């Protein structure tokens, strides 16, 4: 078999040498092989951060990799273009061997028609306009090579004047929305004097949308406001208006508050619900005599509260925290107006949660060997119980055992064949909360916070200054309790 491969590669080498390792012999008439780009020339480009960012984007837009590109570069090529040589040597053949060689080892040439510099310059000009260079232009030139069948490209970019934002006004919004925009003006993504940049303006529109949706505007969407730009009044600058559309559903112009929060707990997707447990903040619906999950656990994970304004960020956090418990196979939040009148401004929240399978079981088997001549098997078994005590806990059991014996002769003949063994077990309980000693109950902590606020009011201080900032966790805090034992008996 080795001799066959050597013969095959020797035959390929002879063919390549006989054809002179040509990279253009099979190029069709009227076509030229694209051999890369010369570095792009940037005319009148400044060194600002914005201009540097635009240049980096243009380098990507204008780039076309030639055959044998080094590290994906459009300007550097490897001197050994074996795939291209094989394609030129065998692509015009009609035998099965020729077709196999082209398919297995050949690389199709990159032609000038594929490089298509006209298309790249058009895309580049559009990019310049989107990034504020309205007068920018891009041209290219063909750079002939010694072989008339080969051609290089070189682009020239004239960026021109950078247009900036003269004013950015928010037009047509309601007084409540205007107040929100003014209160968060320091968070704006762009402002007067900044470069005119479509991507930055789009980020600002997205920020306004998120701001509204975090402050009760449940039905507001990004497409309900659009930009109007005036680049004529003051040359070199653009007056921009973010304007609310005229025909908008009235529900998007008022704030919505949370009323009832309903949680549907199912062990399977189509399980029927026949029991409801009412609480101060939650209504839990389930099947059976008692809830499969304690109310306190749900209250900790659901950050939307009765009487609060709707918040898209809290909705997303609630969804993430429910998923992070590890006890649900799927969760879904939905919001329903309490009635269909035009004055309605309250939403009922429905959280549909389907429990994952209650048990997981695994078994692992290994075979071990040591340089001392000892060999033997090892077995590990584990069982996990989800929601073990109706508090979202994960209860894990794990047992392991291993046995080994000595094979062959050893210096101590009496120990040859004698066995060693090991066995043990582990129990762990993972709680979806932090256990902090001496912290006190939630009722005690709330009472302590209430007294601090009352004392601040008595001193004439702003109560907001003594309120502690709410902790934000990117994952549900976990406490793990673990106990394990192991017995090892080793014999020399």
Report each predicted region and the residues it spans.
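Bacterial N-terminal signal peptides that target proteins for export
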Residues: 1-8
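C-terminal motif of bacterial Sec signal peptides marking the signal peptidase cleavage site
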Residues: 17-20
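Interaction-mediating elements
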Residues: 22-324, 333
């Amino acid at each position: 078999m080795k001799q066959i491969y050597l013969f095959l590669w020797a035959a390929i080498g002879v063919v390549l040498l006989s054809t002179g390792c040509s990279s253009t012999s099979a190029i069709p008439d009227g076509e030229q092989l694209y051999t890369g780009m010369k570095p792009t020339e940037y005319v009148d480009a400044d060194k600002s951060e914005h201009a540097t960012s635009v240049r980096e984007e243009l380098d990507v837009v204008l780039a076309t990799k030639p055959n044998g590109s080094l590290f994906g570069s459009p300007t550097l090529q490897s001197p050994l273009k074996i795939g291209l040589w094989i394609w030129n040597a065998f692509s015009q053949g009609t035998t099965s061997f020729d077709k196999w060689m082209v398919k297995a080892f050949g690389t199709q040439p990159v032609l000038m028609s594929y490089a298509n510099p006209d298309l790249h310059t058009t895309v580049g000009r559009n990019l310049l306009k989107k990034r504020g260079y309205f007068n920018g232009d891009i041209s290219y030139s063909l750079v002939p090579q010694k072989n008339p069948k080969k051609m290089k490209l070189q682009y020239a970019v004239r960026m021109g004047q950078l247009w900036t934002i003269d004013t950015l006004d928010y037009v047509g919004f309601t007084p409540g929305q205007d107040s929100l925009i003014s209160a968060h003006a320091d968070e704006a993504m762009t402002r007067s004097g900044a470069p005119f940049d479509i991507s930055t303006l789009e980020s600002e529109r997205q920020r306004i949308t998120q701001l509204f949706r975090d402050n009760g505007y449940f039905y507001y969407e990004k497409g309900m406001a659009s930009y109007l730009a005036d680049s004529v009044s003051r040359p070199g600058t653009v007056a921009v208006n973010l304007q609310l559309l005229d025909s908008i559903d009235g529900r998007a112009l008022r704030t919505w508050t949370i009323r009832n929060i309903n949680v549907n707990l199912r062990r399977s997707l189509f399980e029927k619900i026949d029991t409801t447990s009412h609480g101060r903040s939650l209504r839990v619906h389930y099947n059976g005599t008692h809830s499969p999950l304690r109310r306190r656990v749900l209250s900790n994970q659901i950050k939307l509260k009765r009487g609060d304004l709707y918040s898209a960020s809290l909705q997303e956090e609630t969804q993430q925290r429910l998923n992070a418990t590890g006890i649900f196979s799927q969760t879904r939040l939905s919001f329903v107006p309490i009635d269909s009148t035009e004055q309605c401004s309250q939403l009922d929240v429905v959280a549909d949660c389907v429990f994952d399978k209650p048990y997981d079981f695994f078994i692992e088997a290994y075979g071990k060997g040591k340089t001392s001549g000892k060999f033997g098997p090892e077995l590990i078994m584990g069982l996990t119980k989800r929601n073990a005590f109706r508090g979202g806990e994960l209860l894990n059991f794990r047992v392991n055992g291993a046995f080994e014996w000595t094979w062959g002769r050893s210096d101590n003949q009496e120990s040859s064949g004698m066995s060693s063994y090991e066995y043990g077990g582990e129990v762990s309980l993972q709680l979806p909360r932090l256990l902090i000693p001496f912290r006190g109950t939630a009722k005690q902590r709330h009472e302590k916070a209430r007294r601090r606020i009352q004392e601040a009011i008595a001193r004439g201080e702003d109560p907001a200054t003594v309120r502690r900032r709410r902790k934000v966790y990117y994952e549900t805090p976990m406490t793990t309790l673990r106990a394990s034992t192991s017995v090892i008996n080793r014999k020399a």
